[in-house]
Amino acid sequence: MNIAITGLGIICAIGNDCQQVLDSLVNKKTGVGMMKYLQSCHKELPVGEVKLSDDELKTLLGLPVGSLYSRTTLLGAVAVKQAMADAGLSADMLVGKKVVLISGTTVGGMDVTERILVEMRDTLQTPNTQQQSPVDYVKRHDCGSTTNEIAQICGLDCEVCTISTACSSAINSIIVGCEMLRSGEADIVIAGGSEALSKFHLNGFNTLHILDTEVCRPFDATRVGLNLGEGAGFVVLQKEDVNAKAYIGGYGNKCDAFHQTASSDDGEGAYLAMREALESSGIDKSQIDYINAHGTGTPNNDPSESVALKRIFGNDIPLVSSTKGFTGHTTSASGSIETVICVLAMQNKFVPVCYGFSHIDEACIHPFEGDDKQHRMDYVICNSFGFGGNDSSLLLMKHDRSLPPPSPVEREPECDNKSPFKGDLEGLGEFIVADITIDSMEQLADYKEYISPKEGRRMGKLMKAATLTSLMALREAGIECPDAIITATANGMLETSEKFLVDMVDNGEETLSPTLFMQSTHNTIGSAIAIRTKCHGYNITYTQGKDSMKWALRDAERLIRMGKAKTVLVGCHDESSPLFQSFYDYLNLSVPQIYSRSVVLKAK
């Protein structure tokens, strides 16, 4: 079954809608420049900002200017509304249908939290009168809340899901959306991602010394780093092909299982993701017309991706470019923003140039530099590779294509009009072969059988607990390396993130720790377990508040019942942290200090 893309929505540094973005690409106009809205001291760093203030975005959405929303929410709502309108859908038309909104983000509400953190802390010194106070924003800080708010602003009364796999989040949202359509869990999926620039974000990447002080130059011999960007991209996915803009023919989600921030020299994760996208589509590699590369412009990513491309295509590599010289690296939103860009290129038969490229690097592929020709754009691959080696690829097709019958291991379950996957452990009893929980600090004391003292000293309590329950569950199940790793977390590495945030707010932006930032992404746990177990299989992280585990279990059951995995490690991991615990206490919210549960599912 090929999934139809029936609506497109985009807002980024080169335009506030599809037409503006198309014009900028055709006219080779970059959106990367001096920061205007982000209030950072690092003015030397160019960024790909959306050319609208928060107040202008609120006005565009019909929201009160005085209302408090994260920029992630606002950008996402703009793109979702565009995609719905492009598909000819209104909220009223969706009543009675199984609709799902899936968004990818990592920043979530951080742009607001960092701005009002001092005010939030000061409020702790005053009595809680049960009226709205700055502390209340802690309930909206998380990634899942931004997706809830996007749905609310767009009038969507539907299932809501958030995925956070760093820079591959948005493509993974699209992949999950396709799987839900194939399984009968949804009639219509609106999938993509949204990410706002924040000081936390900017300074984190800056501590890694991978930001360029000029416009980035992917695959260029003189490249030194990336430019951060922001924006949102969403697509409407349907099984019907009415007014289809393009089709999704295949996709791959694999893990490099190499390092938390660096890509392997042989590009294993990228290679496996592209190979799976090709195999699942039935398209021969010789038919690919264009590849939108992840191409960040960093010294590490570009040669690694180039090796992966050469492993797939040999000496016959299709036209390749990275569009991050136009938009900046929009991190969690990059996959969906670039998916929309790919569809625009397919519709208009042009290949976006690799902006900024001028010097050949023998260690990299030679990207497309531009011409005046129209190009066949029938089959296109879009790559997104994230921290932790969460690598995903999407294969887009201009026309519908009848595929050969699926093999027995790829058969789809027979479904009625109800969701076949409930996301609860009770319904999965037949598959559960191990179930381990840690919910107290005392249980972390005896970890040395699984974690060395040296490792333990470097780990925070959540990483220690997650590693312990995961390895104990795998041992109990008699499995060294699972086929897939699925993680659920409401707040991710909260203690690590809090330390970085507080240090930045209290001591400025100049002396921050790269180690803290490297361990702040929500997919840190899932990727660390993959690295430890050498698992190159499917790897994803759900972050939808209290429903995170439900989404993770639904995905795991789907993989098993559809024959895509025989063994799946599912983990639910969350923690509290000193300052955030003070906020929770102030609001009389009950949050455990530590909670880690790992379950192994095995097909019969």
Where are these regions (language model features)?
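Short glycine/serine-rich loop segments
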Residues: C178-L197
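Active-site histidine-anchored catalytic micro-motif
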Residues: S173
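A short, small-residue-rich loop immediately preceding and capping a beta-strand
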Residues: E159-T165, D187-G193, V568-H573
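Short conserved active-site loop signatures built around small residues
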Residues: A170
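Conserved "HGTGT" condensation-loop signature of ketosynthase/thiolase-family condensing enzymes
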Residues: M1-C158, E179, S198, N206-N227, ...
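A short local structural element in Rossmann-fold oxidoreductases
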Residues: L202
